[in-house]
């Protein structure tokens, strides 16, 4: 069977929740069993968080950050196929490393005014898609050079000129796309945000 577990702090009876010892750093260390299938949803407020999801059995993921500094790692390959991973960042600094190990069919990102890095290093086993929406922040995409990449933008972006791509209208295609064994299909929507593509050797 399946079970639902909720961890966190919440107010009760319209009151407030306080944490004693405010002069000391408040630290939480949460670990999950690598034997259990996980549909994981996390929300981080004003905190500094490091989350390593490597080696777990992760079937879906939602990460939502507020005014925080968050790093999500896939240090090892996911033990099962992940259908979707969603990342939502407000005025936050978010770094996701090892998305190639996540084995997610689709990744979606929605960003506000923060700085975000999506790193696709890892052991790729299939093609994947990324839907990225960016308001006023900065988004850096780090992609292995062996991966074929297609980027489709909602509108023409004069400032978006990624190295190693050819452009046809609002569509950008990496030079190796036709011969690459693995592919990343990116749909990009941005207004005033800046997007950078960095190749990983």
Which residues make up each language-model segment?
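A cross-kingdom signal targeting lumenal/periplasmic-facing segments of multi-pass membrane
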Residues: 9-30, 35-43, 50-52
């Amino acid at each position: 069977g399946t079970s639902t577990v909720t961890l966190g702090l919440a107010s009760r009876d319209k009151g407030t929740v306080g944490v004693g010892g405010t002069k000391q750093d408040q630290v939480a260390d949460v670990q999950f069993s690598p034997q259990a299938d996980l549909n994981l949803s996390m929300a981080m407020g004003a905190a500094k968080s490091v989350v390593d999801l490597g080696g777990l059995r992760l079937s879906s993921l939602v990460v939502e950050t507020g005014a925080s500094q968050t790093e999500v790692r896939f240090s090892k390959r996911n033990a099962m196929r992940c259908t979707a991973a969603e990342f939502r960042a407000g005025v936050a600094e978010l770094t996701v490393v090892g998305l190639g190990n996540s084995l997610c069919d689709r990744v979606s990102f929605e960003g506000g005014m923060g700085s975000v890095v999506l790193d696709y290093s890892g052991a790729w086993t299939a093609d994947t898609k990324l839907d990225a929406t960016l308001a006023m922040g900065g988004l850096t995409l780090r992609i292995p050079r062996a991966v074929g990449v297609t980027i489709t933008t909602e509108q023409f972006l004069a400032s978006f000129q990624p190295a190693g791509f050819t452009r046809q209208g609002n569509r950008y295609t990496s030079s190796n796309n036709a011969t690459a064994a693995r592919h990343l299909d990116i749909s990009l929507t941005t207004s005033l945000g800046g997007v950078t593509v960095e190749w990983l050797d």
